[in-house]
């Protein structure tokens, strides 16, 4: 018997329960990724019911905190509700994270919602080169996990004015910018490996993971060959957009012909992203509390919710 309840898109959309849509078409356009076509229908039928579910979870957590405050006779700031969103490169998890961030921030009982991507915790390019793992960017070993876990731990401890490094997809490196995170009501952490746990490292049983701090977890899923196709399509769009910007690490790819670019993207997928998906990301899927399963057209077709 499956540990998940399965919902068709139509059945799931009914769980919206008349919650009003608070985002406009313009809002959605600003939130979607380069290779996504996020429609109002998708937002209403998939993400609005999900925001309602998450709101109920947050409310339950806030009620529990108020009991604790009553018992301790204090009004200390409650720790944030932390949501993790995982999935492959090019599957659309960043768009999912941005849409949920926007929707959740419009609920009156938790208006302060922050979104942090784990990209900011990648080792700088120089260090990846020194370690000889530049070709493994995105793999667990390419992240400063100690720094990432410390950040999430500090957020949960209620520490104010935390700083998160900012990553640039143009320079392919950590920048000098920082993002401030100051005791949000809800924190969304989006990244490839946020659902990894001690089960992935049996030789190191005392290690602490981001997943240890999550209150709710989402995995954005699709067939591997479908994601590969999306990756190639995204690569071709970047080739005509982001790769042409001054200082772009990938500017040399703009000189490739269309066919050469397709072959290069397929090679990168085959040698890096596909392996990372199979070895490190996909094994964490079953740990998620909710799985959004997408079809070839980028639309969510099935929702799996842990019982």
UniProtKB/Swiss-Prot annotation:
<feature type="binding site">
    <location>
        <begin position="87"/>
        <end position="94"/>
    </location>
    <ligand>
        <name>ATP</name>
    </ligand>
</feature>
<protein>
    <recommendedName>
        <fullName>Pantothenate kinase</fullName>
        <ecNumber>2.7.1.33</ecNumber>
    </recommendedName>
</protein>
<dbReference type="GO" id="GO:0005524">
    <property type="term" value="F:ATP binding"/>
</dbReference>
<dbReference type="GO" id="GO:0004594">
    <property type="term" value="F:pantothenate kinase activity"/>
</dbReference>
<dbReference type="Pfam" id="PF00485">
    <property type="entry name" value="PRK"/>
</dbReference>
<dbReference type="InterPro" id="IPR006083">
    <property type="entry name" value="PRK/URK"/>
</dbReference>
<keyword id="KW-0547">Nucleotide-binding</keyword>
<dbReference type="GO" id="GO:0015937">
    <property type="term" value="P:coenzyme A biosynthetic process"/>
</dbReference>
<comment type="similarity">
    <text>Belongs to the prokaryotic pantothenate kinase family.</text>
</comment>
<keyword id="KW-0808">Transferase</keyword>
<keyword id="KW-0173">Coenzyme A biosynthesis</keyword>
<dbReference type="InterPro" id="IPR004566">
    <property type="entry name" value="PanK"/>
</dbReference>
<keyword id="KW-0963">Cytoplasm</keyword>
<dbReference type="InterPro" id="IPR027417">
    <property type="entry name" value="P-loop_NTPase"/>
</dbReference>
<keyword id="KW-0418">Kinase</keyword>
<dbReference type="GO" id="GO:0005737">
    <property type="term" value="C:cytoplasm"/>
</dbReference>
<keyword id="KW-0067">ATP-binding</keyword>
<comment type="pathway">
    <text>Cofactor biosynthesis; coenzyme A biosynthesis; CoA from (R)-pantothenate: step 1/5.</text>
</comment>
């Amino acid at each position: 018997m499956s540990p998940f309840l399965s919902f068709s898109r139509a059945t799931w959309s009914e769980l919206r329960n008349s919650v009003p849509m608070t985002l406009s078409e313009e809002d959605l356009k600003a939130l979607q990724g380069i290779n996504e076509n996020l429609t109002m229908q998708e937002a209403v039928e998939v993400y609005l019911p999900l925001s309602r579910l998450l709101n109920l979870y947050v409310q339950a957590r806030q009620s529990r905190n108020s009991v604790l405050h009553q018992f301790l006779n204090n009004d200390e700031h409650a720790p944030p509700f932390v949501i993790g969103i995982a999935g492959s490169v090019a599957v659309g998890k960043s768009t999912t994270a941005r849409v949920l961030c926007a929707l959740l921030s419009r609920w009156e009982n938790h208006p302060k919602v922050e979104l942090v991507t784990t990209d900011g915790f990648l080792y700088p390019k120089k260090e990846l080169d020194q370690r000889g793992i530049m070709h493994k960017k995105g793999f667990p070993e390419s992240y400063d996990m100690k720094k990432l876990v410390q950040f999430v731990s500090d957020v949960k401890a209620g520490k104010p004015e935390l700083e998160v490094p900012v990553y640039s997809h143009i320079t392919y490196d950590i920048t000098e910018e920082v993002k401030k995170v100051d005791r949000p009501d809800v924190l969304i952490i989006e990244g490839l490996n946020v659902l990894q746990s001690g089960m992935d490292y049996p030789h190191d049983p005392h290690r602490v993971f981001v997943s240890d701090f999550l209150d709710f977890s989402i995995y954005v899923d699709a067939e591997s060959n479908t994601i590969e196709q999306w990756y190639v399509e995204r690569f071709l769009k970047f080739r005509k957009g982001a790769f042409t910007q001054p200082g772009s690490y990938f500017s040399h790819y703009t000189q490739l012909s269309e066919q050469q670019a397709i072959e290069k993207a397929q090679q990168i997928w085959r040698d890096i992203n596909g392996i990372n998906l199979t070895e490190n990301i996909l094994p964490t899927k079953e740990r998620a509390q909710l799985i959004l399963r997408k079809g070839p057209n980028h639309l969510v077709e099935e929702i799996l919710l842990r019982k």
